[in-house]
């Protein structure tokens, strides 16, 4: 009994409540089909578990099958599982023998997955201390790299000295490249074929593709000696054949000397871009690169003029396959190009190379430290039909979902990764996956298989008597009928039964398209929404109208598409109560006499009426004129009279508010004020039925008299009248004077005066005669006398 309870707990543990009902209505008729429905579905193989309804009810969640009466031993529910085959502990500290180093755990496991299910496993990676390093120096020997060649003549000794601080097991090798020795990549005159630099003039080696010069060795002086002997070469175009050289350096494992248990570093040094892919078609080379080693007995690339340049994808495959980490050491002009390449190549880094390679030692050391500070997982193998997701748990203890890389790690730190794997379909074959850290040889091998078969499928009763006289095979509790027979127990012959009896009327689908016709009788399908029933499966209990998302308003039952309301409810949705208790106001009047009782709720007719029984109606009666005193006080009040206005407003049962409100339910009002202004405002009611006054304003007010203008007008009028009167007086005086003058002149003209001399008048001159004057002429002498 205890074992059964444990098994039951494990069955229930994998239950998914959200999709629990998906099994029962899936229509699965075999155990395999049921398992494909979802990872939460199980099959009951118990005999006589179902009746005429057939095999559909056998597929359900484990707990539902138990509730239906299926015994636990007959429940087929294979679960996803992980079986670890090898799990050596991670290495700690320095290891004397490199073959004993373990940097990933576990190393091998078997993963069995239910389709749609997910299994999570944990992978741990720890980079061990003092790990062996193999470094291959691959140099561009085109003419522009002449000064760089002089700089690295002592590089071997200096590099070995610096690397000895990081590892006690270091080896280095050397190789060089230029370009494919074929037109149009090289000069083709006889003299320039022998010496491509003859036009300078300068002697340099003939153009070559790739030369492997020094296998990996721990003799640094041997490296220096080899470098001193090197000569430059030349080609025509700017891009070089560097990718040809990278491919050969990666795949020629034995000739280069790559060890199995070491870190493989390939340092690529150049000041130019590299040809790749179909660039070689310019030279008539059309055979794709095969990714194989083609070094001849002189350690030169023998297929340089035959095979195309490798593509980026081919380089990635071979670098990953041989655990080679690429370090691009390139000049400033080429950095952006090789950064794009490095983004595609796992584990690749880019360093800025000085014009004469003066910083190459620091560049290599920095790149090595960067590579050792990162742990990144990569997946190799056939992943079609699989879903893999990673969650990284780095040394800082923080989870990074959807990430399979940890940075800023120290050597000896452990990086953990949760790897979730799921399979989408059933397949008979097993597949092999490899998960490994980029650049390391340690791997986790995973054998993945789909768990789609039921144990009961191994027991088949052919032509079983349980299937109506042997008309079928009995397997997993159901009959698989032989050709020509049908029915849950193969009791019907296809030639004996017509589906017409399962049609409601000619032209209609059999069993209304919602069931199967077995022996002239409809067996309705299961539905996640409810029951399908009727002689033709034409009815159900879930297709009725809904109210607020509830079938028949939750106040009735759905029967064949129509709501059958319970007592006290009516309406098409059963959403209308027949009770009027909620419509009666406190005085017993229905809806306070201001509305109608509809479906147990008051629908108020009067504008402004509200409340459950229309008891609130601030706008009923004369709502505008009754608030006159409040409104006029508000418009004329200053700060000191504010309290007085509040009292007046309260007396009218209203308050004034400047807050926002809905105008849809407001009542507009207008009053004539004492100052003959038109006062407008809006009245609303709050949730408690209190009257709120909004938007008080005055308009169409008569304008007040302009006193200064009136005074100015009066003054101007008085002045004008004075001037006019003065002018009139002047005219009258002038007229009178003229009249008097005329009269005087007339009288003077009528006067008759006598002509004579005034006896009192004496003239002003006197005449005397000089008797003594002797001349003949008469002289008049005028003497003037005052006396």
Swiss-Prot record:
Query: Which residues are involved in binding Ca(2+) 2?
Result: 179, 235, 237, 239-240
Pfam families annotated for this entry? EGF_2 (PF07974), EGF_integrin (PF23105), I-EGF_1 (PF18372), Integrin_b_cyt (PF08725), Integrin_B_tail (PF07965), Integrin_beta (PF00362), PSI_integrin (PF17205)
Segments in the Extracellular topological domain: 22-708
Region Interaction with HAX1, residue ranges: 730-757
Q: Which UniProt keywords apply?
A: Calcium, Cell adhesion, Cell junction, Cell membrane, Disulfide bond, EGF-like domain, Glycoprotein, Integrin, Magnesium, Membrane, Metal-binding, Receptor, Repeat, Signal, Transmembrane, Transmembrane helix
Is the keyword Nucleotide-binding assigned to this protein? Answer: no
User: Which residues of this chain are annotated as glycosylation sites?
Assistant: 48, 97, 260, 387, 418, 463, 471, 541, 575, 695
Oligomer status and interactors: Heterodimer of an alpha and a beta subunit. Interacts with FLNB. Interacts with HAX1. ITGAV:ITGB6 interacts with FBN1. ITGAV:ITGB6 interacts with TGFB1.
What's the stated role of this polypeptide?
Integrin alpha-V:beta-6 (ITGAV:ITGB6) is a receptor for fibronectin and cytotactin. It recognizes the sequence R-G-D in its ligands. ITGAV:ITGB6 acts as a receptor for fibrillin-1 (FBN1) and mediates R-G-D-dependent cell adhesion to FBN1. Integrin alpha-V:beta-6 (ITGAV:ITGB6) mediates R-G-D-dependent release of transforming growth factor beta-1 (TGF-beta-1) from regulatory Latency-associated peptide (LAP), thereby playing a key role in TGF-beta-1 activation.
What name is this protein filed under?
Answer: Integrin beta-6
